[in-house]
Amino acid sequence: MRGLIQTRLLETGTLRTALFLSCYGRVFSSVSDGKGKVSYRERLRSGIVDIKEDDAVDLFQEMTRSRPRPRLIDFSRLFSVVARTKQYDLVLDLCKQMELKGIAHNLYTLSIMINCCCRCRKLSLAFSAMGKIIKLGYEPDTVTFSTLINGLCLEGRVSEALELVDRMVEMGHKPTLITLNALVNGLCLNGKVSDAVLLIDRMVETGFQPNEVTYGPVLKVMCKSGQTALAMELLRKMEERKIKLDAVKYSIIIDGLCKDGSLDNAFNLFNEMEIKGFKADIIIYTTLIRGFCYAGRWDDGAKLLRDMIKRKITPDVVAFSALIDCFVKEGKLREAEELHKEMIQRGISPDTVTYTSLIDGFCKENQLDKANHMLDLMVSKGCGPNIRTFNILINGYCKANLIDDGLELFRKMSLRGVVADTVTYNTLIQGFCELGKLEVAKELFQEMVSRRVRPDIVSYKILLDGLCDNGEPEKALEIFEKIEKSKMELDIGIYNIIIHGMCNASKVDDAWDLFCSLPLKGVKPDVKTYNIMIGGLCKKGSLSEADLLFRKMEEDGHSPNGCTYNILIRAHLGEGDATKSAKLIEEIKRCGFSVDASTVKMVVDMLSDGRLKKSFLDMLS
């Protein structure tokens, strides 16, 4: 930008072409001076509202070439116009060129400089300009101080802003509402919302009347941080203080309440604002619809959609997509399809989220042909599928045991510029593991690592489980030991897989050692861990140890579940201990559980070959 200015300053002569004059005529609503040429003074005084960079530079050039030189008020007017168009860096460059031309600043040009410096986060330069003001013998006014205070607050330097307020007061300047609003905003940006509220209360005590600008940042931070109860209290306080409310303030709190899951409170506030004469807009409706949909309350979401349409507020793609996704999750695919048709009839184009939700619905219903058709449709409409779209469809193929089709889609998606993520690889690896195609699964895992797609805890669980289930527990243990040494945080789920794999490989003693070491690793066993270990001990024939562990799990705060009881009942039946099994059956009933199909089958088989009395069967009912 500076280079552009310097280049223009090297140019000589008057305005260069008729085309250029024509441009000025359009931009500045120029007035002729009788010679066909419009002076810079007339341009500046004609009330410029907007100005482009090139035009500002050219006008500045003309001003610096003029003799006698323009007054500083004319430069101030130009800088103000450029600043209003948010070309702050350009203003600073023009100010620099003015200095190089030997044109001294005054209070107004320096104040404009300070404002621009603060706007583009150049605070050191802003304070340098402040120093020039004092050096030239001017006294900074309240506006200048407030500008610097706001700049400090936007940078998160609130303590320095407060010090500057003290200095401002010492110099005899009283802070204005603009000053205090800047401080409130700064405190909120730093997450100090309680301090912001205290400052507002002090403002009121000292005679200041806060306005809607004061409260806006506080409400936003409160709602963003989940402090919606405090936001509601503040709203009531605003009403008491006769602060002007609007739909935006209600929208902030409604959004916060929806994100907190307080949907009924959000809906009550929605009704309250309507009663008070504030009309809900598309943003508020969409916020509520999404909130209800995420909570599974599709009926309330659908009612709001109909209410929108009734009030002539056209729902957008976000509202329709939220409802379609909710219908899919609730298993209401037909309703989702109907809503998709309706949005098209209303001229609303579905987006990636819409199509992806419908593809998800078709995959869940095993309608893969329709899912593929929807994928083709979205591409034909110029709507690009994302990684989630492909992950859903690949998962659909895997669930339908069409793993090769899933792999083919996986290879094709890279041609569309979509990069596979951890979920993509996890889905395919699990699919191949479940089909017993362990070599392909291992190859995919290696490909995942080589392509720098970082495996997560789920990736390792899938791989370790696949290795254990497909007869490679040693390889699973080798990988497990590596990740245990890494910085990855392991949960009880991954330990359960390894303990289960060891038990199935008849390495019950090793499994027991790992089980006993869990507390030392800072990992708490869950009911599944106990069930696996009890099952392993039973499989080994160590029923007394299994019974002891069964009682110990209760002491450790883990109540046995139906699976625990069934494991022990079958183990004792297998050892011919009908009495112990009978006691466990009575206990399982008291706990509200029931014997499972495997236990019933075992009892029936034992009855048929005479190993149990027929009276034992009555105990199961």
Swiss-Prot record:
Pfam family, one: PPR
Keywords recorded for this protein, A-Z: Repeat
Lineage: Eukaryota, Viridiplantae, Streptophyta, Embryophyta, Tracheophyta
Biological process per Gene Ontology, one example term: RNA 5'-end processing
Protein name according to UniProt: Pentatricopeptide repeat-containing protein At1g12620
Protein family membership: Belongs to the PPR family. P subfamily.
Disulfide bonds: none
UniProt organism field: Arabidopsis thaliana (Mouse-ear cress)
Assigned GO CC terms: mitochondrion
SUPFAM superfamilies named in the record: HCP-like (SSF81901)
Mapped PPR repeat ranges: 36-70, 71-105, 106-140, 141-175, 176-210, 211-245, 246-280, 281-315, 316-350, 351-385, 386-420, 421-455, 456-490, 491-525, 526-560, 561-595
Organism domain of life: Eukaryota
